[in-house]
UniProtKB/Swiss-Prot annotation:
Keywords: Cytoplasm, DNA damage, DNA recombination, DNA repair, DNA-binding, Endonuclease, Hydrolase, Magnesium, Metal-binding, Nuclease. Belongs to the RuvC family. It catalyses: Endonucleolytic cleavage at a junction such as a reciprocal single-stranded crossover between two homologous DNA duplexes (Holliday junction). This is Crossover junction endodeoxyribonuclease RuvC. Pfam families: RuvC. One of its GO terms (biological process) is DNA recombination. It is an enzyme of class 3 (hydrolase). It comes from the Bacteria. It is found in: Cytoplasm. Mg(2+) 2 binds at E69. InterPro entries: RNaseH-like_sf (IPR012337), RNaseH_sf (IPR036397), X-over_junc_endoDNase_Mg_BS (IPR020563), X-over_junc_endoDNase_RuvC (IPR002176).
């Protein structure tokens, strides 16, 4: 059994999703939740909350591997910078506990789950619900975190079949 923590980083809310993968490659939902960072004081205090909150979650759920969504350039450079800083704090929380970090772009996650890199959030939420047999509507940040964990599980399974590491299994020749 392998436990994967998926992280959808954000400067206000960070999505957390945890799945277990059995020996047959089947995914099972373990936990999902947002880590709410608003109301934690200035931005540096939010980063501190993210670092400590993820650390506590890692200690509680003991994942074997971590998958995190890469930063994309959004509407403003300032927003992208804050998102990058939140992502950096999340990665620090993971590597401080000697866990491997695997990174996936949003388009790669959408492609892995829905079959097209331009899929919208509702399609991703729907597929996550189906794949993990979840009832009810998922919050976008939780769905994205679970989606990145599922993506890593798929890449991991492909890598094992091919006898390569996960980075080699996902990389494309340009």
């Amino acid at each position: 059994m392998t436990r994967i923590l998926g992280i959808d980083p954000g400067s206000q809310r960070t999505g957390i999703g945890i799945i277990d993968i059995d020996e047959g490659g089947r995914s099972r939902h373990v936990h999902h939740a947002p880590l709410i960072l608003l109301g934690e004081g200035d931005f540096s205090q939010r980063l501190k909350r993210l670092l400590h909150g993820l650390g506590e979650l890692i200690e509680t759920y003991r994942p074997d591997e971590v998958a995190i969504e890469k930063v994309f350039m959004g509407k403003s450079a300032a927003s992208a910078l804050k998102l990058g800083q939140a992502r950096g704090a999340a990665i620090c929380a993971v590597v401080m506990r000697d866990l491997p970090v695997h990174e996936y772009a949003a388009t790669e996650v959408k492609l892995a789950l829905v079959g097209k890199g331009g899929a919208d959030k509702l399609q991703v939420q729907h597929m996550v619900g189906i794949m993990l047999n979840l009832k009810g509507k998922l919050q976008p940040d939780a769905a994205d975190a679970l989606a990145v964990a599922i993506t890593h599980a798929h890449v991991r399974a492909t890598a094992q079949c091919l006898g390569v590491n996960t980075q080699q299994a996902w990389s494309r020749k340009k």
